[in-house]
Structures are given as structure tokens and as C-alpha cells.
Amino acid sequence: MYSWNTIRTFCAILLLIPVVHLVYLVSQDVTASLEPSPEAWSEEIAAYAAADQSARLPVKPVVVIGGRQVKLWQGLEDLLSPRPVLMRGLGDATVDDMTHYHSELIGHYQPGILVLLPGTSEFHIRDSKSAEELVTAIRKLVKLDESYDVPRQYYIFAPIKTPRYSQDYSKIDETMRLLAQWAQGEPNVTILDPNTLLTSRGGRPNPDYFRLDGVNLNEHGYLRISLLLQNTLDQNLNEEYASIGIR
């Protein structure tokens, strides 16, 4: 029989594992964030390539790209099943970084659906973009992808408002407005606003949906944006079927 102190210590270690993992990810990302070149993420790109060599890649998957918020996003694969899903997050990477690695993150997988979740890094440290600059970067990424004449649908999240960075709220509101305006002329682009599902009655981000760092979503927050994506995908598919007479 194990002593009570031994059992308590073991349980404490189990509880600390997720925290240690997050601290490890953050420390890696902070170091990389100080490097302005997209090469800061070359090791993560190489790790994905190595994993792909021993995997059977799905046909026309849903590919989700972004920064740390994508790396920490769990459960989407099960929720969107039987659609195959590949999560391809890169530390605190920006949209410009993802454009740089287009071949590795998008072209290699030939997705039927591309999902983009921009992170807070767009407005801090490496970039400090304005809303207009972020939307321009997103449009550049989509235009590059479309230049290969491979038909696919694009689902683009507006950046998530976080409890920690209240100074970003006006930029995010303007980003959402500009994205919605642009998407009106882009039939293959759908804009998703996660903030309507993550705020309290006062319109500020609800801490119940975020980790203690005030930046990254917890499991409750991720469930809400996962359901938003799932419902939007299903709705668009039903509309497509209806347009060709399938019910």
C-alpha cells in the first residue's frame, strides 16, 4: 500500500503536467517571437514534415493554420469527423509567416477547406500590425493560394479578444469589419466572429473561457469556437446541396 503523502504527491504531479507543458510551449514561442524572420519556425515545420513521412495523409482534409492558439486547440478532429482534420499551428507565427510557409502548411496537404485563426502576435512584438495591415496580409495569403487554381473553401476567424490585451479590442473590431467587407466579393471565403461567443454581457471577454494567462482559450472556449466552425461548415454544405437540388 502507498502512503497518503505518496498518493497526494503523485496526484499533484499529474495536475502540474499541463501547466509545465504550457510553460514549455510559451518559453519556446517567446524566444522565437524575438526573431523577426519566418525561419524562427523552421524546426516546427521540419517536425511536421518528419511526422508526415510516416503518416497516410488524408484526401482534401480540413487544414487549420495559425499560431499557438491552433497548437493548443484540441478536440476539433473528433467534432468534425468524418471530415479529416490536420492542425498546423506554428508557435506565435503571424499570417506573413504562414504565407512564407505556404507550400509546407497548405500546398503539401491539398486541403478542401482551409481554416485560419490569426493570433495576438499580429498586434505585438514581431509585427504590431494595424487592422488594415492584418487584412491585407490575409488577402495576400488567400490570393497566393488561389493562384494555384486549386478550388477550396476558406474559413477565416477574426482575431480573438483576450482579457489580457484590452488595447487590441478596437483593432479587432475594425479587422472584423474589413474582413466582412472583403468577403462580400469572395464567394469562397467565410468570415467567423468568435468574439460573440466568448464575451460576457458587458461585451468584454469572459475569463471563464480563457486560461489563467488571459490569452489562450481553455477547453470551454475551444468548444465554443469548435461548434461555431462545425455549424458554419454544416450550414454551408446544406446550402450547397440545396442549390443543386439535393436534400
Which residues does each predicted region cover?
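Catalytic His-Asp segment of secreted/periplasmic serine-dependent ester chemistry enzymes
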Residues: 163-247
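Oxyanion-hole/transition-state-stabilizing segment in secreted/luminal serine hydrolases
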Residues: 70-79, 84, 97-135, 159-163
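Structural motif
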Residues: 61, 113-115, 153
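Conserved beta-strand segments of alpha/beta enzyme cores
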Residues: 84-86, 153, 188-190
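Active-site segments of SGNH/GDSL-like serine hydrolases
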Residues: 117-123, 145-174, 195-201
